[in-house]
Amino acid sequence: MRVMLIQPPMYHLKMQLSPNLGLGYIAAVLERDGFEVQVVDAAAESLSFDGVIERIRAFNPSLIGAGGQTPVSRRSMTIFGRAKEEISRDIVTVAGGPHFSFADSESLAEYPQLDVIVRGEGEETMSCLCKRVAAGEPLDDLRGIS
């Protein structure tokens, strides 16, 4: 199964970029588990939303993950919405990071394009989640998700 992890675009005139280590850690765990993973750091690559959508289309993942802190949370939802509208409604969308961990119920109610939220540290939860999605198993009793 293919998984894409995305750091959303940022549009600040002056900003200091630092790598999103969380996405790297999650990618390493998923690769260890045999998943084909691509990380897209739209901020570092100066990608627009259109550029991110093209990357998703080219890679054709079954699951996309994004999230982060509150300032980029809506950008993640823009990516999820466009991916489901323009590529496939079957793409499983997963958000994580501080914003979604603390506002999980509100986020799921506000964003219909959001399928799952991983709360807290995501490495092992994402591993279990991806294994279940790949096997077509239910997620109901999976710990660490909303």
Regions found by a protein language model. Name each.
Residues 2, 29-146:
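Glycine-rich beta-alpha loop elements in corrinoid/cobalamin-binding modules
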Residues 2-14:
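Nucleotide-activated donor-dependent transferases that construct or modify glycoconjugates
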